[in-house]
């Protein structure tokens, strides 16, 4: 035993010697540091920023730029102006006008490390914790006011199956005591609630509250001062998992301070009612106190003379009679008011019935007018008045954004940052994010408006163009029929007058028919039903006076370009092609371009693939080549002239055949354009 004790003593002595050596070493190191600081103290006092000639080992330089000089960890942020530290580590600078946030968490019992300026009032909190405290205050006060105004809407009673034998609860009024933990202030008006435990199997409810609201002290929109004392509870508050999604969203927005709270409007509406109730209660209390004081005085005083007693009794009787008469008058007034209200309701019902009948009549008239005006031209719908007023109201409504636009309009971004003296990078990014979200919503609305406007204008153009074309076609058919009838009548008259000269008359009739056909073609070209090029009998393209094969003759067109395939030294294909086409070749010459390997080999792979894809697409989409119309017409005309000189008897049959051939050619050309 003695040996063991000696060994322990020796070990303790060795440990003490080691600790003393470490202490001496640390003190020597500390002395060296203090000397270095004293030597360089002049540079620190003159300016907060360290000069480049300082002897302190500062590792805050990187690529010729100064960074934060924090000793706790390597910080890559730049320091503030006239200081050596960034915003997060500015508290390491003793001369900086900042102090630490006074917020202490209830769970970890640690203090917040964010800096706060000295100019702010006590208690000093950073922006985030200040907002948390304000939002919690609002929520607690709203819940208290709601429980006062509507006790049925308070937290529901628990079921017996969900409550255990031992259960504790905190009322919604206890949340006011938790605010003192945030702010550090203790109000004398508030009293902590006590919780009790019960061992009974069945739950028992003991709910006694004494609430004294000083509403007369409210100035403007200030919050009411509450003095609360709640007795014990023995049941748990059960969270409602079956809440509506809107309520859940509003709770989340309350935490972030975006909305004004669930009971904010109810609080405003019920302020007047609460004031009136409070005044009535005070009046009743004063009356009771006055009556009690009178009773006490009567008991204390000696018995007066019978005359005085009779006088008092008479006065009391008179007062009672007056009260009875006043009550009767009040009842009569109430009855009269009820009768008046009933009469007003009956009148309103009659007026509503009359209005409904008038509306029905107006609707019937509108339906009849709409039926009459269905065939009217739609050009009036695009006047200046319609575009300025009705389109903006009805047609150019923005798409549904899930109520994001309302949130952005109601949301005040300066609410967070108005009272803050310094902003971190995260807060600055948050502010910019809000502004960008507003811009995105504006651009979406504008895009939808332009899109709907283009749709309406396109429909209007199509409807007007179709109606005009139908009218023109009907008018032209009538004119052509009249001309044909006149020509036939003239020919019959000539035949009857000149029976002797059959040969000459037949020749004249043939010439007249040819001239009439040419006149018809010229008229149709002038009216815009045929292409303006010579000897072309094809319908023109939309918004132009030329067909597809002769579209290059139109000087105003800007979509088409000629094919660049060289047929000979000085000639090109010249067939119209879209300018977007790559390569600039028509459908027939694309195959030749594919087979010409010498040109394609010199190109890179990606360009080859792109050209092949374009060629395949254009083969499917390119319009088919048009049938030349001029050659067969000229040939038929020559045959007609030769046959007329040889055989006069067979001229009528040949002319009919030639006319039928010309009509078939026109139909073929029209079908090719339509395809």
UniProtKB/Swiss-Prot annotation:
One Pfam family per UniProt: zf-C3Hc3H
A GO cellular-component term linked to this record: nucleus
Biological-process GO terms, alphabetical: DNA recombination; DNA repair
Keyword field contains DNA repair: yes
Origin superkingdom: Eukaryota
Segments of this protein annotated with the region Disordered: 1-39, 183-203, 274-324, 473-523, 627-675
Main subcellular location: nucleus
Chain intervals with Basic and acidic residues compositional bias: 664-675
Biased composition (Low complexity): 282-318, 482-519, 634-648
Keyword terms, alphabetized: DNA damage, DNA recombination, DNA repair, Nucleus, Transcription, Transcription regulation
InterPro entries recorded: Potential_DNA-bd (IPR025927)
Any coiled-coil regions, as ranges: none
Subcellular location: Nucleus
Family the UniProt entry places it in: Belongs to the INO80D family.
Subunit structure of this chain's protein: Component of the chromatin-remodeling INO80 complex.
Biological role stated in the UniProt entry: Putative regulatory component of the chromatin remodeling INO80 complex which is involved in transcriptional regulation, DNA replication and probably DNA repair.
PANTHER family: INO80 COMPLEX SUBUNIT D (PTHR16198:SF2), PTHR16198
Protein's name according to its UniProt entry: INO80 complex subunit D
Annotated source species: Dictyostelium discoideum (Social amoeba)
């Amino acid at each position: 035993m003695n040996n063991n004790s000696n060994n322990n003593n020796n070990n303790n002595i060795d440990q003490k010697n080691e600790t003393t050596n470490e202490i001496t070493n640390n003190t020597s190191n500390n002395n060296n540091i203090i000397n270095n600081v004293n030597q360089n103290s002049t540079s620190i006092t003159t300016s907060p920023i360290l000069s480049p000639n300082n002897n302190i080992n500062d590792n805050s330089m990187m690529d010729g730029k100064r960074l934060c000089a924090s000793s706790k960890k390597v910080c890559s942020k730049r320091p503030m102006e006239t200081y050596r530290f960034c915003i997060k580590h500015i508290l390491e600078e003793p001369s900086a006008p900042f102090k630490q946030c006074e917020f202490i968490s209830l769970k970890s019992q640690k203090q917040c490390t964010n800096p706060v300026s000295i100019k702010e009032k006590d208690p000093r909190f950073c922006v985030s914790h200040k907002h948390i405290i304000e939002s919690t205050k609002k929520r607690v006060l709203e819940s208290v006011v709601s429980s006062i105004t509507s006790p049925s809407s308070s937290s529901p009673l628990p079921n017996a199956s969900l409550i255990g034998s031992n259960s504790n609860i905190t009322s919604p009024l206890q949340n006011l005591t938790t605010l003192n933990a945030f702010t550090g202030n203790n109000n004398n008006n508030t009293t902590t609630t006590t919780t009790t435990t019960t061992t009974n199997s069945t739950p028992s409810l003991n709910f006694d509250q004494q609430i004294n609201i000083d509403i007369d002290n409210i100035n403007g929109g200030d919050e009411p001062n509450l003095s609360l004392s709640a007795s014990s509870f023995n049941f748990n508050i059960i969270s409602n998992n079956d809440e509506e999604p809107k309520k859940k969203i509003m709770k989340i927005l309350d935490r972030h301070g975006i909305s004004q709270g669930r009971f904010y409007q109810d609080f405003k509406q019920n302020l007047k009612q609460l004031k009136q109730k409070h005044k009535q209660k005070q009046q009743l209390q004063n009356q009771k106190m006055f009556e009690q004081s009178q009773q006490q005085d009567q008991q204390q005083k000696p018995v007066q003379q019978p005359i005085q007693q009779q006088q008092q009794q008479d006065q009391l009787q008179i007062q009672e009679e007056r009260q009875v008469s006043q009550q009767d008058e009040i009842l009569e007034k109430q009855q009269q008011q009820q009768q008046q209200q009933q009469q007003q309701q009956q009148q309103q019902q009659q007026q509503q019935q009359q209005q409904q009948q008038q509306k029905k009549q107006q609707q019937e008239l509108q339906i009849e007018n709409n039926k009459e005006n269905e065939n009217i031209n739609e050009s009036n719908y695009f006047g200046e008045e319609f575009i300025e007023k009705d389109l903006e109201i009805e047609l150019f409504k923005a798409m549904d954004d899930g109520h994001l636009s309302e949130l952005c309009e109601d949301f005040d971004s300066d609410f967070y940052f108005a009272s803050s003296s310094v902003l971190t990078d995260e807060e600055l990014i948050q502010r910019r994010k809000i502004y960008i979200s507003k811009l995105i919503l504006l651009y979406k609305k504008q895009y939808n408006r332009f899109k709907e406007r283009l749709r309406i204008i396109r429909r209007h153009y199509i409807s007007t163009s179709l109606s005009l074309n139908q009218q023109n076609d009907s008018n032209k058919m009538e004119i052509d029929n009249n001309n044909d009838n006149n020509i036939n009548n003239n020919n019959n008259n000539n035949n009857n007058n000149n029976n002797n000269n059959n040969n000459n008359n037949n020749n004249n009739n043939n010439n007249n028919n040819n001239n009439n056909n040419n006149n018809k073609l010229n008229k149709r070209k002038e009216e815009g039903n045929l292409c303006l090029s010579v000897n072309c009998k094809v319908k023109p393209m939309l918004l132009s006076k030329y067909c597809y094969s002769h579209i290059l003759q139109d000087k105003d067109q800007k979509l088409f370009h000629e094919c660049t395939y060289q047929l000979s030294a000085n000639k090109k294909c010249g067939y119209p092609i879209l300018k977007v086409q790559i390569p600039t070749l028509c459908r027939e010459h694309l195959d030749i371009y594919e087979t010409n390997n010498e040109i394609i080999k010199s190109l890179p792979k990606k360009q080859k693939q792109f050209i092949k894809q374009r060629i395949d697409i254009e083969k499917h989409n390119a319009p088919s080549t048009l049938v030349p119309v001029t050659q067969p017409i000229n040939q038929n005309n020559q045959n007609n002239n030769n046959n007329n000189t040889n055989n006069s008897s067979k001229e009528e049959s040949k002319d009919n055949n030639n006319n039928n051939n010309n009509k078939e050619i026109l139909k073929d050309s029209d079908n090719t354009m339509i395809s």
